[in-house]
Amino acid sequence: MKIDILTLFPEMFYGPLNSSILKKAQEKGIITINYINIRDFTTDRHHQADDKPYGGGAGMVMKVEPIIKAYEAIPKNNSFTIMLSPQGRKFNQKLARELSQKEHLIFICGHYEGIDERVRQLIVDEEISIGDYILTGGEIAAMVIIDAVARLVPGVLGDEVSAEEESFSDQLLEYPHYTRPRNFRGLEVPEVLLSGNHKKIDLWRKKQSLLNTLFRRRDLLKVRGLTKEEKILLWQGFFELAMLIDEIPERSE
């Protein structure tokens, strides 16, 4: 199995992924792990890989261009790209088994406030979360997944051992993040984030957060519940989706 890790902090991986079972697996050639520093694919002299979010708000957002350039520089063969995200599929042993069947895994580790939404749209096959809590970045989550998956790759534990025996804010998922450029490969930043109208921006973000949670982690809403105003926002979101569907021409069978 080949594993490529896109990160701003490759040094975080050197100890955990180069010791014990994982070290032996790499020495045997069963697993190959490469660390790609996203800053190496920036174009400015300061190697800036993040920028202020469109629409305002706290924190910085990781830029789309250096991540895509780093991704495109990786030789690929049946690759499967994972972005570590609190709004992703919950990681468990079943998912670890699925991933252990892949030939090539690519991990994208977020940091700061988040990653430009267009990264997910362009290259991500699966978003994965390791739990309902907040970490500084995706690096530790990637280590958890890599460790769990590697143990299931044939030959890693040895024939004598059977592997089979062996942030949330307000309980809602986050809204999509965007930063410069405004247009990337035809994917535009939502117009409302460029309006300067902070009331509209706040409503859009709350609506997207509610829709994200409903579609991806409905179990959180069942525990949390919804206010009357939040239900209205969701219905508005459904209406907007219906309008988009109506704009698509019918296809003759």
Curated annotation (Swiss-Prot):
Subcellular compartments: Cytoplasm
Keywords annotated in UniProt: Cytoplasm, Methyltransferase, S-adenosyl-L-methionine, Transferase, tRNA processing
Molecular function, one GO term: tRNA (guanine(37)-N1)-methyltransferase activity
Binding-site residues, S-adenosyl-L-methionine: 110, 130-135
Catalyzed reactions: guanosine(37) in tRNA + S-adenosyl-L-methionine = N(1)-methylguanosine(37) in tRNA + S-adenosyl-L-homocysteine + H(+)
GO biological process, one term: tRNA N1-guanine methylation
GO cellular component annotations of the record: cytosol
The enzyme's E.C. designation: 2.1.1.228
Keyword tRNA processing included in the entry's annotation: yes
Principal EC category: transferase
Any Pfam family matching the protein: tRNA_m1G_MT
Alphabetized InterPro entries for the sequence: Alpha/beta_knot_MTases, tRNA_m1G_MeTrfase_C_sf, tRNA_m1G_MeTrfase_TrmD, tRNA_m1G_MTases_N, tRNA_MeTrfase_TRMD/TRM10
Homology family: Belongs to the RNA methyltransferase TrmD family.
UniProt subunit comment: Homodimer.
HAMAP family recorded: TrmD (MF_00605)
Function: Specifically methylates guanosine-37 in various tRNAs.
Protein name: tRNA (guanine-N(1)-)-methyltransferase
Source species of the chain: Carboxydothermus hydrogenoformans (strain ATCC BAA-161 / DSM 6008 / Z-2901)
Gene: trmD
